[in-house]
């Protein structure tokens, strides 16, 4: 009889087709359509901002890990993803140093200070965006509208919608494709490109369908209830970017099915409340960050029951 070569080791025994590097590489592939649209419409400066954020993120991670005498793990591509997502959250008018400061904050403070990859309790790119918006609101709210034939500065569709100036709104098709005019940050101008990337991630099994689907449905239903166009709310601003690439962050979102549904509903509700009743026209970033903070509580109450285990009731004291 042939001898079997068996390896004895402690659990958990994980057999997965995806490594951390392959997951991050798939996310980058999914972001390429939106990056291509940004480069086509905005020009080389959009690509330069992305490169600045990526280089700053990777360099910061390497330096911090070196200082802490930890293994340098920049080859897992997670810092690259953070850099791209941060750049996608910047307006085209942002100076280069905004990208550098945001990248350092995202990696050094939000990620490495809490233990590194998988230990951050909020999304690093969104936390950096919130930090930059609070510190330099002028640079972070200067949004350009750039038709392919001219360049003009104007308000975003969400600002127009909030002000009730619906007559000045671009067409839904323009908002969906992002090709006939630019409204918003670098990576959020084309809902179509982001949708293609998001569907790719779902197809590859990188993200669950629950969070983006429930998030978008919540926004659509809320918009219908208040008499507004649900399509406009879904394809404008950072909703598509947030739904597929931000809210689905492994470290800061629930892992249970029930938890993901509650989390996504919360993201959608807070997004619409801020958009319609808050002082800022866009609520996507803050909604996801708030639900990131609520994730441990959500998981506590939605964790799966262990089969065969029952709670023992304590006897009442006499």
UniProtKB/Swiss-Prot annotation:
Reported cofactor(s): FMN
Keyword Thylakoid: no
Primary localisation category: membrane
Pfam families in the cross-refs: NQR2_RnfD_RnfE
Regions crossing the membrane: 35-55, 77-99, 114-134, 182-202, 206-226, 261-281
Assembly notes: The complex is composed of six subunits: RnfA, RnfB, RnfC, RnfD, RnfE and RnfG.
Family designation: Belongs to the NqrB/RnfD family.
Protein name: Na(+)-translocating ferredoxin:NAD(+) oxidoreductase complex subunit D
Taxonomic lineage from the root: Bacteria, Bacillati, Bacillota, Clostridia, Eubacteriales
